[in-house]
Amino acid sequence: MLKAGIVGLPNVGKSTLFNALVANAQAEAANYPFCTIEPNSGIVSVPDPRLNQLATLSSSKEIIPTKVEFVDIAGLVKGASQGEGLGNKFLANIREVDAIVHVVRCFENDDVIHVSGSVGPARDAEVINLELGLADLSQVEKRRERLKKQARTSKEAQAEDGVLERVQAELEAGGAARNVALSAEEALLLKPLGLLTAKPIIYATNVSEDDLAGGNAYCQELAAVAKQEGAATVRISAQVEAELIELPEADRAEFLAGLGVEEGGLQSLIRATYALLGLRTYFTTGEKETRAWTIQAGMTAPQAAGVIHTDFERGFIRAQTIGTQQLLEAGSLAAARNKGWLRAEGKEYIVAEGDVMEFLFNV
């Protein structure tokens, strides 16, 4: 399951956004599995209209969406890398996530105090990035110290230390671990450290309701920072998300349209996260259930089958495949088969976004 950590300075709207996302997901997907793990962590169902359309087509008894766990990570202040505030707890929590959603205040409001006295997206981003970088630098230095003796006789330790030396140089220059070009083997050496600046980052520009559709100068300022870092950005409004909670689901689309946007913050954030991490969705559908499955882009049909069960991958023979839109156009699997639209794909097939698949296997 994808796990995203939501970080940000105090009073940027981080917790408001988290609470709204989790509450909206629960309201939007009342018939989907949902749970709150603890007050600062919630598993939400990924909104996907294709899932409901396929379930209707198949008269499915159950709908099972993919899920994302959002973690509201508290305690990040200047000096967190030295344990200030809830720094140590913050760092332990964030090391476990797949991606970091960095909420940055991009709205003016005299009633909401800014910790630095004024709104400054680039400055705020730098504060958090500095803390992440300092925490990583400390961890890399400690690891290299432990490797000293091993590196005298172990080629593996020498290889790891060589990678860490390059990462340390980047961190000392104020950069991020993700900026260091690594081979697949070298990346595996780094993975156990859970370096914070190696994780993909999305900047969520938290704007007022009036700026949700078009953004503002603060958004442009942060977009320039993100471009320089190779990070993603998504515009979001904690204020709007909180208002959505109070509306009946049937009225939400009209409310968002009135603001000039087509989707709420949860959809925008998940879409951006999937794109950043290179994730794809495929479906299985039938009378028993219609289900969405998350895979990495580039996965072959057997690998995608293995996400369901390892036996499916081990004994893979072929996959009956059709695109979601084509299946919906046909009206049923039987009609699609009669039209010759169902494809038998083999072991080399790369699964496409939105494929509907049925696997034939033998173990």
Residue ranges with predicted function:
Residues 34, 48-51, 64-70, 84-98, ...:
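Amphipathic alpha-helical transducer elements in NTP-driven molecular machines
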